[in-house]
């Protein structure tokens, strides 16, 4: 008589030619979920760990930015360095923009490989097959690459933020930071609640109008810069600040919903960057509002 059948886990691992648990950075993600299933369709433990990774990365980004800004506010030598090397500020702006776009638009390796015809992925020898599977340079194929690019983006943003916050007094900056924290916590908890799941049905149309609002803000800023509008006017700054505060609060709400319901489990770095941008822009808008309110008083 034959012995009892092997356990399901052992049999599955032999069928797929790999152990049941992996040692890589995404070990908690089963292979069938990792590449083709959005987060909302995964098991609860996977959703929880994905949320933990996103907010851990986001917390590190915000802590690094806050620490650098605080260092700049208390260190006279760092203030002198920042003020005497304005060119470095513009370099950091360019680096931040490039790394942000790269993280945002870089295709997933699985999407790129899926677009390659099947005959090209099989060869007569192992070495040609490996050559054919080689991804383009702009595809971030490993977690380490994504994390490195996110670190470069965060450090560049932190340097730019330090120069901006030096232009305001400490009380105004702290007030803006407190208000931003309250708004972010409130919006995030609201967006993650089940009662607002139906908002996703109209997320595409909402994003359309949000993007229009963003382009209006960009147009206002460029017009003021090129044609000499009085950007120091309290009315202009208040209008610009309130428009930005409303716009990026809506962005934060929609992005939080989309991130935990419409993305894949291996996109935590991109998600953290999106939330970080929403929070930073919201903070800058609130800072502008408070600064001009103080000037009027």
Swiss-Prot record:
Cited Pfam families: Bax1-I
InterPro entries: Bax_inhibitor_1-related
GO cellular component terms listed in the entry, alphabetical order: endoplasmic reticulum; endoplasmic reticulum membrane; fungal-type vacuole; membrane; mitochondrial membrane; mitochondrion; vacuolar membrane
Record carries keyword Transmembrane helix: yes
Residue ranges annotated as Cytoplasmic topological domain: 75-85, 168-171, 230-239, 292-297
Cellular localisation: Endoplasmic reticulum membrane; Vacuole membrane; Mitochondrion membrane
Disruption phenotype: No effect on autophagy during nitrogen starvation.
Organism domain of life: Eukaryota
Lumenal topological domain: 1-53, 107-146, 193-208, 261-270
Topology of this chain in the membrane: Multi-pass membrane protein
One term of GO molecular function: calcium channel activity
One BP term from GO: endoplasmic reticulum unfolded protein response
Bilayer-crossing regions: 54-74, 86-106, 147-167, 172-192, 209-229, 240-260, 271-291
Keyword annotations: Apoptosis, Endoplasmic reticulum, Membrane, Mitochondrion, Transmembrane, Transmembrane helix, Vacuole
Family: Belongs to the BI1 family. LFG subfamily.
Protein's job: Links the unfolded protein response and programmed cell death and mediates mitochondrial-dependent apoptosis. Induces cell death and disruption of the mitochondrial transmembrane potential via the mitochondrial phosphate carrier MIR1. Dispensible for starvation-induced autophagy.
Protein name: Bax inhibitor 1
Gene name per UniProt: BXI1
């Amino acid at each position: 008589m034959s012995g009892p059948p092997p356990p399901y886990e052992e049999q599955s691992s032999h069928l797929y030619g790999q152990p049941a648990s992996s040692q890589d950075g995404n070990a908690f993600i089963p292979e069938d979920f990792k590449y083709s299933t959005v987060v909302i369709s995964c098991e609860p433990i996977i959703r929880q760990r994905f949320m933990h990774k996103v907010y851990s990365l986001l917390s590190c980004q915000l802590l690094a930015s806050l620490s650098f800004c605080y260092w700049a506010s208390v260190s006279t030598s760092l203030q002198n360095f920042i003020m005497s090397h304005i060119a470095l500020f513009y370099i950091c702006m360019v680096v931040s923009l490039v790394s942000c776009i790269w993280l945002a638009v870089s295709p997933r390796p699985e999407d790129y490989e899926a677009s390659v015809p099947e005959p090209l992925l099989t060869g007569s020898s192992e070495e040609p097959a490996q050559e054919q599977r080689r991804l383009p340079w702009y595809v971030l194929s490993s977690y380490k690459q994504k994390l490195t690019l996110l670190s470069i983006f965060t450090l560049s943003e932190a340097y730019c933020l330090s120069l901006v916050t030096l232009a305001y007094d400490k009380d105004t900056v702290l007030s803006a930071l407190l208000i931003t924290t309250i708004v972010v916590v409130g919006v995030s908890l609201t967006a993650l609640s089940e009662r607002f799941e139906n908002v996703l049905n109209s997320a595409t149309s909402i994003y359309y109008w949000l993007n229009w609002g963003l382009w209006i803000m960009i147009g206002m800023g460029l017009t003021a810069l090129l044609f000499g509008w009085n950007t120091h006017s309290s009315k202009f700054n208040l209008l610009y600040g309130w428009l930005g505060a409303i716009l990026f609060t809506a962005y934060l709400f929609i992005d939080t919903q989309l991130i935990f319901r419409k993305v894949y489990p291996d996109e935590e770095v991109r998600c953290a960057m999106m939330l970080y941008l929403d929070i930073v822009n919201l903070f800058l808008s609130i800072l502008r509002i408070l600064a001009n309110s103080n000037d009027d008083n």
